[in-house]
Amino acid sequence: SETPKAAKPVDLMIFATKESGLRGAMETASGFIGENTLMLSVLNGVSSEETIAARFGERNVIYCTAQGMDAVKVGNALTYAHAGMIVLGEKQPGGISPRVQQIADFLNTHGVTAQPVGDMVRRQWGKLMLNVGINQTVMVFEGDYGTVQKPGKPREIMLAAMREVQKLAGLEGYPISEAEFDDWVNLADSLSPAGKPSMRQDGEAHRKSEVELFAGTIIRRAEKFGLDVPVNRWLYDTVKQMEAGY
């Protein structure tokens, strides 16, 4: 109930905004963040932790993904078939640290399913791979999860975009195995066919999407390796054209 001006440091700060709102949220939260405050970002992609670390230092940044949810928000009503879960861990691979376990226990105790892992950044690349495929494809084809769960052009585009991320992740030092690739595709296939990813909902509401966080990130990072990512370039250009028409 404290205002930012009267703030005192908290034990845990969770950032749960859109990418476009992160910097503003950090400024609002700055008074609540002290030298021992742990920070957790549930934003999509692989860059929000870097943004937070640049502002507050990386020592207390816990890496995280939110996955498996199929929520659809219309007005002020939120519906879902799968609530999903939080996966969290340290930046450096290894065991599960006491502070990560403590956060996971706290979340699980308060009704948020959380799983601590020892290979968090690689997990983030897997989630980014899924988002790059499913979010952008469903937006471009103006469909729902069911659109990419059946054979056809949309599914082919989704899988091709994911393959490009798989190649890039390996070059970045976070290889995604074929078995893991299949697991992410199976996760996509398990979502409610009538559900819609956040980018599709942004498109329907004529809001700017997170295409920079997805295809934009892939294109920029691929360039430093000389990796061609034509499917993501096509998705990026198509989404930008759609947004220009709002």
Task: List each model region and its residues.
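Short, flexible turn/loop "capping" segments at secondary-structure junctions
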Residues: 6-7, 79-82, 192
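A general structural signal for well-ordered alpha-helical segments in protein cores
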Residues: 10, 22, 48-49, 100, ...
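Glycine-rich beta-alpha junction loops
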Residues: 44-46, 65-70, 92, 120-124, ...
